[in-house]
């Protein structure tokens, strides 16, 4: 797809005659084209002060603020964040030093043959307690360093859900009219909307769950060991053998394990499959819902005035730079009650996913969108083409 998009956006063999060359669009035409794209691909469009792809233009006052932050906040925050990362890596290294990693029964096929999932999340005892508690604490400290000094968390009144969905409560009335409390079912997964890589830090600080990650993450310096302590599910999307179970199969097993085994790590899933600008909720993939177990919906919102921390069209380097430059960042969290599926939802994962998605959109005041990752890639490729035309236009004017 990427090669096709490149063919659409550029010509490898430009015409030799000047008359045959396509005229460059005026700057106003390009601005109108980008505005039209933003409307079509609204879930991925940036609406903050930093503009499309974070490229501005910036007001003079903003340039001054960025210049001051570059020589004050950025170096300090960078050093502190790297120190925290290194400290937690050392904690994980020390407390897993004489422990063999857990090798799950699930297998995946890659170029090197059959490989096993490996993690330290199945450890028990005081060593595991130290890893989890220090991980949660340092994740919150890291968010503080990034400017998230306060995180507002809210839990909608669970009592309001008792009439509409009796399964959301574990308290029943016995024959004598007394409240008989039963132990609630453990959710098989936490499901959340996906706005930024910062989502992971929040969830680590709140519940320290496992995540789905590329297999290459497990081999990264520092982060690789930390991901194993989280119990990440590593996937190799390029591997497709006859026995390959795929991402859904592996996730399904982990969800069932987390639901039935209290000592197993809870798994955290972003069913949208990609990030948005935080105002929309994309179509959910069914991986978190195939097992038919209860899920815990969590909604993350990042209010902003200048720079939006949503990771939509902006590059990773620019995003981190502007994040470190912003003095204060905001995060609001809505933790919904555990959602217990009906029998109909258990039998139909798509219905289950759709109903949870609608609930999250209603409670989080999010707009439903049917776009997906492929649309985001098209949007990015088209934006890159238009912006390259803008650069050509300015060069011609000069």
From Swiss-Prot:
Main EC class the enzyme belongs to: transferase
Source domain of life: Eukaryota
SUPFAM superfamilies on file: Glycerol-3-phosphate (1)-acyltransferase
CDD domains in alphabetical order: LPLAT_LPCAT1-like (cd07991)
Residue(s) carrying Phosphoserine: 28
Disulfide bonds: none
Pathway: Lipid metabolism; phospholipid metabolism
pH relationship of activity: Optimum pH is 6.0-9.0.
Region (Disordered): 1-24, 158-185
Polar residues: bias regions: 163-174
Membrane-spanning ranges: 66-86
UniProt-annotated location(s): Endoplasmic reticulum membrane
Knockout mutant characteristics: Delayed senescence. The double mutants lpeat1 and lpeat2 exhibit impaired growth, small leaves, short roots, reduced seed setting, reduced lipid content per fresh weight in roots and seeds, and large increases in lysophosphatidylethanolamine (LPE) and lysophosphatidylcholine (LPC) contents in leaves.
Reaction(s) catalysed by this chain's protein: a 1-acyl-sn-glycero-3-phosphoethanolamine + an acyl-CoA = a 1,2-diacyl-sn-glycero-3-phosphoethanolamine + CoA; a 1-acyl-sn-glycero-3-phosphate + an acyl-CoA = a 1,2-diacyl-sn-glycero-3-phosphate + CoA; a 1-acyl-sn-glycero-3-phosphocholine + an acyl-CoA = a 1,2-diacyl-sn-glycero-3-phosphocholine + CoA; a 1-acyl-sn-glycero-3-phospho-L-serine + an acyl-CoA = a 1,2-diacyl-sn-glycero-3-phospho-L-serine + CoA
Pfam families reported in the protein's UniProt record: Acyltransferase (PF01553)
GO MF annotation list: 1-acylglycerol-3-phosphate O-acyltransferase activity; 1-acylglycerophosphocholine O-acyltransferase activity; 1-acylglycerophosphoethanolamine O-acyltransferase activity; 1-acylglycerophosphoserine O-acyltransferase activity; lysophosphatidic acid acyltransferase activity; lysophosphatidylethanolamine acyltransferase activity; lysophospholipid acyltransferase activity; plasmalogen synthase activity
GO biological process assignments: phospholipid biosynthetic process; phospholipid metabolic process; very long-chain fatty acid metabolic process
Keywords linked to the UniProt accession: Acyltransferase, Endoplasmic reticulum, Lipid biosynthesis, Lipid metabolism, Membrane, Phospholipid biosynthesis, Phospholipid metabolism, Phosphoprotein, Transferase, Transmembrane, Transmembrane helix
Membrane topology recorded in Swiss-Prot or TrEMBL: Single-pass membrane protein
InterPro entries, alphabetized: LPCAT1-like, Plipid/glycerol_acylTrfase
Motif HXXXXD motif, residue range(s) on this chain: 194-199
Record remark: domains: The HXXXXD motif is essential for acyltransferase activity and may constitute the binding site for the phosphate moiety of the glycerol-3-phosphocholine.
Primary role: Possesses acyl-CoA-dependent lysophospholipid acyltransferase activity with a subset of lysophospholipids as substrates. Exhibits strong acylation activity on lysophosphatidylethanolamine (LPE) and lysophosphatidate (LPA), and lower activity on lysophosphatidylcholine (LPC) and lysophosphatidylserine (LPS). Exhibits acylation activity on both LPE and LPC. Has a preference for 18:1-LPE over 16:0-LPE as acceptor. Palmitoyl-CoA (16:0-CoA) is a better acyl donor than oleoyl-CoA (18:1-CoA). Among several different acyl-CoA species the best acyl donor is palmitoyl-CoA (16:0-CoA).
Family statement: Belongs to the 1-acyl-sn-glycerol-3-phosphate acyltransferase family.
Name recorded for this polypeptide: Lysophospholipid acyltransferase LPEAT1
Organism: Arabidopsis thaliana
Gene: LPEAT1
């Amino acid at each position: 797809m990427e090669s096709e998009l490149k063919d659409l956006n550029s010509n490898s063999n430009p015409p030799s005659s000047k008359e045959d060359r396509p005229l460059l669009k005026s700057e106003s035409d390009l601005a109108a084209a980008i505005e039209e794209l933003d409307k079509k691909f609204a879930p991925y469009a940036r609406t903050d002060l930093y503009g499309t792809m974070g490229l501005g233009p910036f007001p003079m006052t903003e340039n001054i603020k960025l210049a001051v932050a570059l020589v004050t906040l950025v170096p300090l925050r960078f050093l502190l964040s790297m120190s925290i990362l290194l400290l937690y890596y050392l904690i994980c290294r020390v407390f897993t030093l004489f422990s063999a990693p857990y090798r799950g029964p699930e297998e995946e096929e890659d170029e090197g043959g059959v490989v096993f999932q490996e993690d330290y999340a199945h450890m028990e005892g005081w060593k595991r307690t130290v890893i989890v508690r220090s991980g949660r604490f340092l994740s919150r400290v890291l968010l503080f360093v990034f400017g998230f000094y306060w995180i507002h968390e809210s839990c909608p009144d669970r009592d309001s859900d008792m009439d509409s969905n009796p399964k959301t409560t574990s308290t029943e009335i016995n024959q004598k009219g007394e409240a008989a409390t039963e132990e609630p079912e453990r959710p098989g997964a936490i499901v959340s909307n996906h706005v930024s890589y910062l989502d992971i830090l929040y969830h680590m600080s709140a519940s320290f769950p496992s995540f789905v990650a590329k297999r290459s993450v497990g081999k990264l310096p520092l982060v690789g060991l930390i991901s194993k302590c989280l119990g990440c599910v590593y996937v190799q999307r390029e591997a497709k053998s006859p026995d390959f179970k795929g991402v859904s199969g592996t996730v399904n097993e982990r969800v069932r394990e987390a639901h039935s085994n209290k000592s197993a790590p809870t798994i955290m899933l972003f069913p949208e499959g990609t990030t948005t600008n935080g105002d929309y909720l994309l179509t959910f993939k069914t991986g978190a819902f195939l097992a038919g177990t209860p899920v815990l919906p969590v909604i993350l919102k990042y209010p902003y005035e200048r720079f939006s921390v949503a990771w939509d069209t902006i590059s990773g380097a620019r995003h981190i730079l502007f994040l470190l430059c912003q003095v204060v960042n905001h995060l609001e969290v809505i933790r919904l009650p555990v959602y217990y599926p009906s029998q109909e939802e258990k039998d139909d994962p798509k219905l289950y996913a759709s109903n949870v998605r609608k609930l999250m959109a209603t409670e989080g005041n999010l707009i439903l969108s049917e776009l997906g990752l492929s649309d985001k890639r098209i949007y990015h490729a088209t934006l890159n083409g238009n912006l390259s035309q803008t650069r050509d236009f300015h060069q011609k004017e000069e």
